[in-house]
């Protein structure tokens, strides 16, 4: 009996928009509440004995056979909401507990769970990343021409200039998708747009059939990945320039899965199913849970595995639960897990105190009508109430703050913009928003409701000290506009989730960091205080923003190297990454101290070098099976991920997977092997350079790799041993090894945990 075991996905990542709502990931609701008597369940089943079901009608018939006979003959609204084909063997249905119990007794039933309701997590970057129109990777990849990027998000804004198809040919013949917008809305850029709303409708009765973006997040991420060139882009007069996505000539396929605050799991599963069926090349998922489940119960991991098997590259947000360790999500090794970094552009608003001190902060709203004269300065929390310090709604006394510059603290679960709205309601003239200690020097440029600036925690402490030092503190804000050239960029954003990787400690995560702070991209509607209703853009922050940067860059590599596997593209991105900032120093974090590998992974993406990496660490789909068996998963659990019946006849430790980085739990000595494939010059030679982690001896054999043809493979081994010379109290140490030729540097980070 040959069973095809596909478990339904607990669809991991959705997103929380990173604008005024801050950068923290929200709590995920564990299950939906459609009615008091029924819920939507994801049902996982096997295939029928001795049969291969490939046609949609056959699958639907099989799935319906699991329903109780009374439901089969019922004239009520159909109980089966979705029948899945590509990413799992199963269906979504609205059932009572009694009806579910009947389903569970059927032969072929595997498991079921209530669907989870998830919530969204949330111009200059091409130049910052070295992308130029007349040379380099853009030209070499033909700007991503012919590649299809599927974006699962909140929809799209058709007609926005970022989605113009000027100069873009029709989609390739393999495209099978459709456009559910009006006949003129889709074009050669926006080739597909669909809404998956059946679960949302069942839950709240709302009909939202059109894939129109109603809040901006989906439009922003889609244009970041593959927006067309748009001249004169700006936000309230700031960040002026030419806006463009990472792959400006790539096609976009939009799958709307979020309606209001709800992104139902079964709707997301249907969108993933469709994206694989439609023939996309890249899937971009700016979504995230607060904690990563094991891979066999991780919807993103399972869906991404199915996509990877078909040659589809999957890029996912790392999550916004930083800077805390072990907060990383989307940690499967077949996913590119993307953290967030700053760029070298700031939109500067300086807090100037009455004693002459100045502290640079950021704000998008910089009204020319604001006169920078010194005004009375007051701390919002002077009454000792925490809610006042956070400038919570209704917490400020109008008489105490009218006409003053008000110092508010970040946090309290209150959006940054909402704090400014409270200051404005109380009659305040301006706001200085100070960071909390956790976010330290990580700042966001927001469209505030009044003149404002967002300053660091250190600056806030000094401003508080000044307020306490005088009976008549004063301050103003100096708006300095857009400033390019911050030498500390790229730096890791405070909110960017960190490793270690809980589901698989032997795989270093995140894989890469990319631009995710104060990112300008398309927006559906004008912002408050905007006078231009035609060119609508907004600035957002989050790993939701860094993910589509890497999705677009992957599309460029796919265009340049159409025969590369998803693992080869991922390897090229990782081994070519930058580890120093524009000031030629090590990349720092929100504390301005050199960061560790759990924040950066391999480093910051460098598209030009990724397009010509020299060597790649390739992995074929079947190579993951012994790795998964080595995690201690049962054969059934591995089969859930692999979409077929599995025998764990062989298993390998995590470190033996042919991954472009090393994450080693080291007690006694360990030896791992790696195989690299030459994708550079046919005749080339690579020498070894090792920076061993403190307290670790690293031996590599051989120490020289010689190639005589393209696609030649060479294998090397690495032995890690403790030396006893390190700090006996340290838990982790880090280093790297790299293979260097006359043209290429192929770098792999090394993270060691002492056990």
From Swiss-Prot:
Glycosylated residues in this chain: 182, 297, 325, 393, 468, 529, 706, 727
UniProt GO cellular component terms: apoplast; extracellular space
Keyword Zinc: no
Record-linked PROSITE patterns: SUBTILASE (PS51892), SUBTILASE_ASP (PS00136)
Protein family according to the UniProt entry: Belongs to the peptidase S8 family.
Pfam families assigned to the protein according to its UniProt record, in alphabetical order: fn3_6, Inhibitor_I9, PA, Peptidase_S8
Compartments in which it is found: Secreted, Extracellular space, Apoplast
Gene, per the UniProt record: SBTM4
Active site, UniProt feature: 153, 217, 544
This enzyme's EC code(s): 3.4.21.-
Function: Required for arbuscular mycorrhiza (AM) development during AM symbiosis with AM fungi (e.g. Glomeromycota intraradices).
Annotated keywords: Apoplast, Glycoprotein, Hydrolase, Protease, Secreted, Serine protease, Signal
Start and end residues of each Peptidase S8 domain: 128-611
Domain (PA): residue spans on this chain: 376-461
PANTHER family for the chain: PROPROTEIN CONVERTASE SUBTILISIN/KEXIN
Signal peptide per UniProt: 1-20
Entry's induction text: Rapidly induced in roots during development of arbuscular mycorrhiza (AM) upon colonization by AM fungus (e.g. Glomeromycota intraradices). Also observed in root nodules that arise from symbiotic associations with nitrogen-fixing Rhizobia bacteria (e.g. Mesorhizobium loti).
Protein name: Subtilisin-like protease 4
GO MF terms held by the record: serine-type endopeptidase activity
Positions of the Inhibitor I9 domain: 41-119
Any one GO BP annotation for this protein: arbuscular mycorrhizal association
Top-level EC class: hydrolase
InterPro entries listed in its UniProt record: PA_domain, Peptidase_S8/S53_dom, Peptidase_S8/S53_dom_sf, Peptidase_S8_Asp-AS, Peptidase_S8_subtilisin-rel, Peptidases_S8_3, S8pro/Inhibitor_I9, S8pro/Inhibitor_I9_sf
């Amino acid at each position: 009996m040959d069973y095809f075991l596909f478990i339904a996905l607990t669809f991991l990542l959705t997103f929380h928009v990173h604008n005024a709502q801050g950068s923290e990931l929200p709590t995920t609701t564990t299950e939906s509440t459609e009615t008091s008597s029924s819920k939507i369940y994801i049902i996982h089943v096997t295939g029928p004995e001795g049969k291969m079901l490939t046609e949609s009608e056959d699958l639907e018939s099989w799935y319906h056979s699991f329903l109780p006979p009374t439901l089969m003959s019922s004239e009520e609204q159909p109980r089966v909401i979705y029948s899945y084909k590509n990413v799992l063997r199963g269906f979504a249905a609205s059932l009572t507990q009694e009806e579910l119990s009947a389903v569970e007794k059927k032969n072929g039933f595997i498991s079921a769970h209530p669907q989870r309701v998830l919530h969204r997590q949330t111009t200059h970057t091409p130049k910052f990343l070295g992308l130029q129109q007349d040379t380099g990777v853009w030209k070499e990849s033909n700007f991503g021409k012919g590649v299809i990027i599927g974006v699962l998000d909140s929809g799209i804004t058709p007609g926005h200039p970022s989605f113009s198809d000027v100069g873009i040919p029709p989609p390739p013949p393999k495209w099978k998708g459709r456009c559910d917008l009006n006949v003129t809305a889709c074009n050669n850029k926006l080739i597909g747009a669909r809404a998956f709303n059946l679960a949302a409708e069942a839950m709240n009765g709302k009909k939202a059939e059109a894939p129109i973006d109603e809040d901006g997040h989906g439009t922003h991420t889609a244009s970041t990945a593959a927006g067309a060139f748009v001249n004169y882009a700006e936000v309230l007069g700031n960040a002026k320039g030419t806006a463009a996505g990472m792959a400006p000539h790539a096609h976009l396929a939009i799958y709307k899965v979020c309606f209001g605050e709800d992104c139902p799991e079964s709707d997301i599963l249907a969108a993933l199913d469709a994206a694989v069926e439609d023939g996309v090349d890249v899937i971009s998922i700016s979504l995230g849970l607060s904690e990563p489940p094991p891979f066999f119960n991780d919807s993103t991991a399972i869906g991404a595995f199915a996509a990877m098997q078909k040659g589809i590259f999957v890029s996912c947000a790392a999550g916004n639960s930083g800077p805390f360790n072990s907060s990383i999500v989307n940690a499967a090794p077949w996913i590119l897990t993307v953290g967030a970094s700053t760029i070298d552009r700031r939109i500067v608003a300086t807090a100037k105190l009455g004693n002459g001190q100045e502290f640079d902060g950021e704000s998008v709203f910089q009204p020319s009508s604001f006169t920078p004269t010194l005004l009375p300065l007051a701390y919002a929390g002077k009454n000792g109430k925490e809610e006042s310090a956070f400038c919570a709604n209704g917490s400020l006394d109008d008489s105490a703050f009218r006409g003053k510059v008000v110092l508010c603290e970040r946090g309290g679960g209150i959006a940054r913009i909402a704090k400014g709205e409270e200051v404005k309601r109380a009659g305040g003239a301006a706001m200085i928003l100070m960071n909390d200690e956790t976010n330290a020097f990580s700042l966001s440029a927001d469209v505030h409701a009044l003149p404002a600036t967002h300053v660091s925690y250190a600056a806030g402490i000094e401003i508080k000290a000044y307020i306490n030092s005088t009976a008549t503190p004063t301050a103003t804000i100096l708006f300095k506009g857009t400033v390019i050239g911050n030498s500390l960029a790229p730096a890791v954003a405070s909110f960017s989730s960190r490793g270690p990787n809980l589901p698989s400690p032997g795989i270093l995560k995140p894989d890469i960091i990319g631009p995710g702070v104060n990112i300008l991209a398309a927006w559906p509607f004008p912002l408050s205080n905007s006078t231009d209703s035609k060119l609508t853009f907004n600035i957002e922050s989050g790993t939701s923003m860094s993910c589509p940067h890497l999705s677009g860059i992957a599309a460029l590599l796919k265009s340049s190297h159409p025969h590369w596997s998803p693992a080869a593209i991922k390897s090229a991105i990782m081994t070519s990454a930058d580890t120093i900032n524009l000031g030629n120093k090590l990349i720092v974090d929100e504390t301005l101290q050199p960061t560790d590998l759990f924040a950066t992974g391999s480093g910051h993406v460098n598209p030009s070098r990724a397009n010509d990496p020299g060597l790649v660490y390739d992995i074929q789909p079947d190579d993951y099976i012994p790795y998964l068996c080595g995690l201690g998963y049962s054969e059934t659990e591995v089969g859930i991920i692999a979409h077929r019946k599995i025998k764990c006849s062989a298993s390998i430790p995590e470190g033996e997977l042919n991954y472009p980085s090393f994450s080693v739990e080291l007690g006694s000595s360990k030896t791992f092997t790696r195989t690299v494939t030459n994708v550079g010059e046919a005749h080339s030679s690579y020498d070894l350079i090792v920076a061993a982690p403190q307290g670790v001896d690293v031996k590599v054999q051989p120490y020289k790799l010689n190639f005589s043809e393209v696609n030649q493979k060479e294998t090397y081994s690495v032995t890690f041993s403790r030396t006893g010379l390190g700090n006996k109290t340290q838990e982790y140490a880090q280093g790297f090894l790299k293979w260097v030729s006359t043209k290429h540097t192929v770098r792999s980070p090394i993270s060691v945990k002492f056990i």
